[in-house]
Amino acid sequence: LKHRSRYAAYENWIKFNNDREWAAVLDQPQFQGLLAEKPTSLFMNETEYSTRVRNAIDKPGGVFELRTYVTKPDKLTALNQRFKKHTAQIFNRHGMNNIGYWAAFDTPDSANTLIYLIHHANRKQADANWKAFTADPEWQKARRESESNGKILARPPKRIFLRAMNFSPLR
C-alpha cells in the first residue's frame, strides 16, 4: 500500500478499521479467525532509481521474488550504485523484470537495508534466471569492482517467492 506519509498511513488505517462496511465483513462467521497473528507493517521509501529501472510485466501470472539485503555499515550507497548502474539492467537480460526498489526506514537495520521486488515467468525459471545472472561476466565484474574495498553484504539476502492475488494490480 502506498501512502503520502507515515502519518497518512496511520490516518488511513484508523479510517479503515472504523469503516462500517469493513466491520460488517469482520462480523461474518466465515471471516472469523482467519489470521493466525496480527499483520506487520514495514514502511519504506522508494529509491531514486526505482522508477527508472522498472519494467512492465509482459505476460500475466508468474512469480514475484521479494529480496532483502542488509549491508555492512556505510555500504548501502555502494549497493544502491551497483543496482542503479549494473544489476537492474543485467537482470533484464536474464528474464527478471524489475518491479521496485525501496529502503526501509523504521527497522533496526534501516540505514543498511535494500528491499526489492522482481518478477519471473515461473519458479523454475527463477532458478535458471539466477544461475545465468551469477555467471554473467558483466555482473561478475560489477560485483568485483563494487567490493574492491571489502564485502558489501552483512549476511546473505533473504528471499520470499510470492504470487499476485487476483485483485492485485500486478497481475
Regions inferred by a protein language model and the residue ranges of each:
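Short S/T/G/P-rich N-terminal loop/turn motif that feeds into the first structured element of a domain
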Residues: 1-141, 146-171
